[in-house]
């Protein structure tokens, strides 16, 4: 087991510990994991388990220095020297869950994000850090195209033979354990044949768009979502219709 795999195993364990009492999982945050790695590396270098680094800084100092917005922060740390990383992961989680103070942090309803970091010394000591944070929603929403509805071929004065098509889409904000911003709107783009993508709707709350597709041509539509915190999702896979 690699250190990265061990960290992801602990991520799953922590969210399983929450699920066991009916709590939603926390979202892993790469920025918090980077700080957790720094914390674990500092403890490994000092050979000491401590919430205060040798330079006097705490997790709050590091989070603030990295420009991470937060309303509340919790930290759990652990040490063991089990040779197998799988055993080290299991034992540190067990240690946290048999401590009322650590369990209260892991199962708190206040937090919505967390990060994990493992530091290993040359002699095999394992230093673990888990950082829990309550902060603004920074998880982008999702959007996807649905199957289009197509009509029969008709004759239009402007296009000649064409087919009426209605594209529709769905989306929502990804839920957090706390402070989910909520879906705000969609951006929609169209591409005719192999041309450039062009916006046809921006910040719209509608969920469908209709157009006529001329025979011999193709129109593709794609969508992305925005949430109320300003997060913008990725473009969906396009759905195209040829007439």
What are the roles of these predicted feature ranges?
Residues 2-66, 103, 109-114, 121-123:
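Short, well-ordered surface patches within globular domains
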Residues 58-136:
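A well-ordered secondary-structure block
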Residues 135-164, 170-172, 242-243:
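Short, compositionally biased P/S/T/A/G/V-rich stretches that sit at domain boundaries
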Residues 172-192:
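Solvent-exposed loop/turn segments flanking beta-strands in beta-repeat/beta-sandwich domains
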Residues 199-205:
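Short beta-strand segments within Ig-like beta-sandwich modules, predominantly Fibronectin type-III
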Residues 229-243:
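Extracellular fibronectin type III
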């Amino acid at each position: 087991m690699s250190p990265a795999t061990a960290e992801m195993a602990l991520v799953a364990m922590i969210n399983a510990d929450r699920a066991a009492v009916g709590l939603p999982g926390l979202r892993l945050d790469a920025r918090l994991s980077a700080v957790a790695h720094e914390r674990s590396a500092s403890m490994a270098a000092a050979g000491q388990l401590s919430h205060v680094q040798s330079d006097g800084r705490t997790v709050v100092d590091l989070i603030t220095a990295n420009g991470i917005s937060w309303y509340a922060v919790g930290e759990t740390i652990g040490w063991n020297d089990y040779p197998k990383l799988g055993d080290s992961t299991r034992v540190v989680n067990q240690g946290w869950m048999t401590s009322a103070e650590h369990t209260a942090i892991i199962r708190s309803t206040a937090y919505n994000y967390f990060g994990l970091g493992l530091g290993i010394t040359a002699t095999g000591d394992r230093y673990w850090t888990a950082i829990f944070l309550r902060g603004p929603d920074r998880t982008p929403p999702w959007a996807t195209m649905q199957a289009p509805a197509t009509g029969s071929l008709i004759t239009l004065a402007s296009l000649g033979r064409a087919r009426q098509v209605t594209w529709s889409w769905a989306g929502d904000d990804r839920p957090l354990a706390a402070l989910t911003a909520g879906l705000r709107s969609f951006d929609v783009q169209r591409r005719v044949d192999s041309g450039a993508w062009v916006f046809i709707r921006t910040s719209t709350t509608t969920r469908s768009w209709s157009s006529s597709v001329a025979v011999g041509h193709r129109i593709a539509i794609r969508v992305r979502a925005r949430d109320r915190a300003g997060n913008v999702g990725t473009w969906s896979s396009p759905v195209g219709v040829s007439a």
